[in-house]
Structures are given as structure tokens and as C-alpha cells.
Amino acid sequence: MLTDSALLTLLQWVSPALPIGGFNYSEGLETLIAQGQITSAAALQDWLGFELAFGSAQWETAVMARVYRAIAKGDFEAVHQWNAWLSAARESAELRAQNWQMGTALINLVAALDRLPPALQTGQPYPWNVSVAFCIAANLADIPLETALLGYLHSWATTLINAAVKLIPLGQTAGQLLLRQLQPQIQQTVQQSLNVTDDNLESCTLGLALASMQHETLYCRLFRS
């Protein structure tokens, strides 16, 4: 059950105003827009919808479900293992740096506002991925797993849509309409992620990987990924 306190905390963690630097990143969108591959709200919806169904958003939420359950059981070794798995799964230096930077900022914020379990304060061989840090924050606030995943994907979509509003550009209303239209796919991705087995953790992110790698050499960049 989502209590009022947990709801307010979730709204804080998914707010675009959260000081973890999400506004600095486009996750390859800047490359695709510069190359003329995404030039409209419809094209952006197709791209984000694919990421939700088959791409990084799909497998990341499946891993987040495992992390959340491991924290709930006190299996902090599994938390570290899945964080390392996510770090290894990043397909470019920019995507890995993005997740580590945002994850470090978020875990520091969580430590300042809440009390981290001692087992999560030390022994981490890699910086925290932002999705793992989000799971830790959600678990400490007693936010239910499914609700936490919905909030995370809503925040992810909001960040990328806001980047596209600047880059394409799109109108603010068009951006909000797109966010509303993605709601069914966000819900479907969360439901699927709750039941994915370890053997079926997979994605098809060739376009994202190439766009992210090519972003490093763009002549002019507004975003860090």
C-alpha cells in the first residue's frame, strides 16, 4: 500500500528538479536529431516506445525489480552484483558515465536525507548506477516495487522528452501530450519486467549504442550523452 508519506517521497525522487544532473543528458537523442532521424513528436514517440518495449528501459526495470527484492531480503551482495551487471551492460562510455554520475549524486542525496544500511555504504567496487540508487531510495521510503518502477520510467521519459523539446524543437504542449501517450507502454513495460527470468534479460539497443558512440564526436553538443 502506498502511504501518503511514501507518495510524497516518490514525487520528490522523480521530480525534474532533483539535483542529480538528469537535464544534462539526452541518451543519444542529440545525435539522432542532428542526423535528421528524429524530427517530430511522432518519430520521438516511436523511438521511446521501442526503448520501452525492447531496449534499455525494458531490461533496466527488470534488473531494478531484482535489486529491490534483494534489498528487501537484506541480500546486499546481490545488490552489488546487479549494480556491476548494469555497469558492464552499458554500451558506451557516455552511457556508463551518465549512470555513474547520476547514481553517485542520488545515493549521496539519499544518504543525506535517509540512513543507508551499513552494507550499502562500503564494499561497492563500482559507482552506483542511478537505477540501483533509485531502488535503494524507494525501498527505504517503503514505496511499493511496482509504483517505484512506474515512477522511474515516468522520470526517464520526462527527461528525454524535455531534451527533445529543446533539440527538435517541440512545443511544451506537444511534449506533455507525448508523455501522456506513453503511459500505456510504461505500464506494460513495468508489468513485463516483474516476470522476466534471468535467462530472458535481453534487449535490442544497436541504435542507442551507435547514437551514443557517435555523440562523442558531434561538432556541437548541448548534452553530455
Swiss-Prot record:
Alphabetized Gene3D superfamilies for the sequence: Urease accessory protein UreF
Major localisation: cytoplasm
One of the record's GO molecular function terms: nickel cation binding
Localization: Cytoplasm
Pfam families: UreF (PF01730)
GO cellular component term of the entry, any: cytoplasm
Superkingdom per UniProt: Bacteria
Record key words, sorted: Chaperone, Cytoplasm, Nickel insertion
Family to which the UniProt record says this protein belongs: Belongs to the UreF family.
PANTHER family noted in UniProt: UREASE ACCESSORY PROTEIN F
HAMAP family: UreF
Subunit and partners: UreD, UreF and UreG form a complex that acts as a GTP-hydrolysis-dependent molecular chaperone, activating the urease apoprotein by helping to assemble the nickel containing metallocenter of UreC. The UreE protein probably delivers the nickel.
Function recorded in the entry: Required for maturation of urease via the functional incorporation of the urease nickel metallocenter.
Protein name: Urease accessory protein UreF
Organism, scientific name: Thermosynechococcus vestitus (strain NIES-2133 / IAM M-273 / BP-1)
